Amino acid sequence: MTDVYRVGYLERVPLGTPYPSIVAHLGSLLGRLPDAELVIDYTGVGRPVFDMFRISGISPIGVLITGGATETHEGFVHGVPKLTLISRLQVLLHEGRLKIHKDLSEAETLVRELQDFRCAFTAAGALTFNARSGRHDDLLLALAIAVWRAADGGMSNPGLFRYYEQQYLKLVGGSSKPRDVVGVDLGQSRDPTAICIVRRISDPVDHIPLREPRPPPQPGNLEWSLIEREKL
């Protein structure tokens, strides 16, 4: 069974929008996607903003982006290495399984963020991933955490669950239900809040015009090109 990840919604909330307004806006979006999960970047804003969602009746999953190599889990918050998040996007790009709806207003912005993202080694020899100096990566991070969760990130024994699901679907002749995840990189003083909605589809039928990311020109190079300026 092949999974494809479709980016169907991208938004950058105006800079300076108060967090209560962002919470209300996301509540409205989730109201239109009743089965969707909300995943937010817990790294910069921490517990106070996370609790705003819970008080409003929304139960998000927090992702604390780390520089390590191992995922951790405490309550509703998962510590996820940035290497894990970015390498997963790389794999999907190479395999042609990350697709973007062609008419999204922020699609070009996301492309630029992907192109501006760089890998580098610290003095201690650790591999790091960061946006080029002076550039934003909010849409990229919203996409990365949404894809992480849509790919069963943070779940216990996801492979076993998918196996039994597939066996059941074979018996009844059905197909896997699409999985929607809303990823949010909460902005701070100089960065806007970014929202990305990803849908995971198994054995999809390509009937919607999409932009398909292209793999990087050289293996392992993060400087890939998702789309070219051409008519689809």
Task: Name these PLM-found stretches.
Residues G79:
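Catalytic cores of nucleic-acid endonucleases
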Residues S87-R97:
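Active-site proximal helix-loop segment of RNase H-like, two-metal nucleases, encompassing DDE(D)
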Residues M1-L64, E71-G75, L83, G96-L232:
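RNase H-like, metal-dependent nuclease domains and their acidic two-metal-ion catalytic environment used
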